[in-house]
Amino acid sequence: VPKQFLEINGKPILIQAQILELLQQMKLKSGVAVLLITHNLGIVAKAADRLVVMYGGEVVEQGSSMDIFYRARHPYTWALINAVPRIDVKLEEELTTIEGTPPDLIQPPTGCVFHPRCPYCMEICRKRKPQVTADGEHISFCWLNHSMAPKVEIPIRQERE
């Protein structure tokens, strides 16, 4: 049960950075766990040891920060990473977005909750919830990770020259 709750969204960036630094120091000194709930992947990359990626109220991927950022296995995670603004691209380039609209949580779609927006959607995605696949502590819920699924190239942007 959390002993403290601290809201940092909406605060100036420098204040957010100072709060995160203070939380990191507290974590190291006292060994307490810090739970961050955020959509800001910059904060996540800097502060989190482990990540749980959720979409439509469901876990779609979970693992270490390194696994999620460098070996993501779910199309929603790929889309999130690709949507992060980068300083090494021209300002004229449009930001990457995730096509479609978020699911209706009152009447969620059958099958995989991400399938209506997923560019890799297969028939099974529309009908059945994905089974968990695990690689050590890195887990994901996506039919693309099934041994019988077609292989796809992971579309995470590479560093540009």
Model-assigned labels for residue ranges:
Residues 65-160:
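Charged, flexible cofactor/metal-binding loops and thiol motifs
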Residues 4, 50, 131:
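Conserved beta-strand and immediately adjacent loop positions that scaffold enzyme active sites
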Residues 19-93:
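P-loop NTP-binding/switch modules centered on Walker-like glycine-rich loops
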Residues 1-21:
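N-terminal glycine-rich phosphate-binding loop and ensuing alpha1 helix
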Residues 1, 28-30, 108:
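Residue-level preference for short coil/turn positions at secondary-structure junctions
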